[in-house]
């Protein structure tokens, strides 16, 4: 079935933000996306939470059984903050499913993968993109998590609440040379 009209209505009504799939994690972003492959994020994470059943909403308020929803909620929160900072949303998923990155930003000369981690993980996809010679536009990445600000192995870590500062940081950014 074709849902294009419904999706366009949700976008035009300001209910969802669209995140397009990149054909390859390379520049330019807008010329490198497949408009038929996309994810939708709510413009207001409260709308996402309101769609949960009452028991699940109670779980969120009492901070239990959060692991089921945590990834989707944090990813939606970051998507919302990026859009409000003026970014268009792009993600990448390799057809084999072995590599997936949540978002991409652009600096003057680089493509920056952004990974949203709900749990402490090893950021396998982010590390693969940074270390691969195949993606020359990618020199470093950003990881958003519950952790503090940090840097290790070409990955800059920021707490979720710093998402709105990424645009300002990106403009004055000078990569650390390892």
Spell out what each predicted region is.
Residues 1-100, 104-108:
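Accessory nucleic acid-recognition modules appended to NTPase machines
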Residues 79, 83, 104, 115-117, ...:
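Generic hydrophobic alpha-helical scaffold/packing signal
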Residues 91, 113-116:
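Short catalytic-loop micro-motif centered on adjacent basic/acidic residues
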Residues 110-112, 140:
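Structural motif
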Residues 118-159:
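Catalytic cores of nucleic-acid endonucleases
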Residues 147-178:
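Domain-level recognition of nuclease-like catalytic cores that cleave nucleotide substrates
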């Amino acid at each position: 079935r074709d849902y294009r009209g419904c999706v366009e209505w949700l976008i035009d009504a300001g209910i969802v933000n669209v995140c397009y799939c990149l054909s390859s994690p390379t520049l330019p972003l807008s010329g490198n996306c497949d408009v038929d492959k996309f994810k939708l994020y709510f413009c207001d994470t409260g709308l996402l939470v309101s769609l949960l059943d009452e028991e699940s909403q109670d779980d969120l308020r009492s901070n239990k059984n959060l692991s089921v929803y945590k990834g989707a909620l944090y990813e939606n929160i970051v998507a919302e903050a990026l859009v409000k900072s003026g970014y268009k949303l792009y993600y990448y998923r390799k057809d084999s499913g072995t590599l997936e990155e949540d978002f991409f930003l652009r600096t003057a000369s680089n493509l920056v993968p952004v990974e949203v981690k709900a749990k402490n993980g090893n950021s396998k996809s982010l590390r693969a993109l940074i270390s691969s010679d195949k993606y020359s536009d990618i020199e470093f990445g950003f990881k958003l998590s519950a952790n503090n600000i940090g840097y290790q192995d070409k990955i800059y870590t920021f707490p979720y609440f710093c998402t709105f500062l990424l645009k300002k940081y990106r403009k004055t950014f000078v990569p650390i040379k390892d």
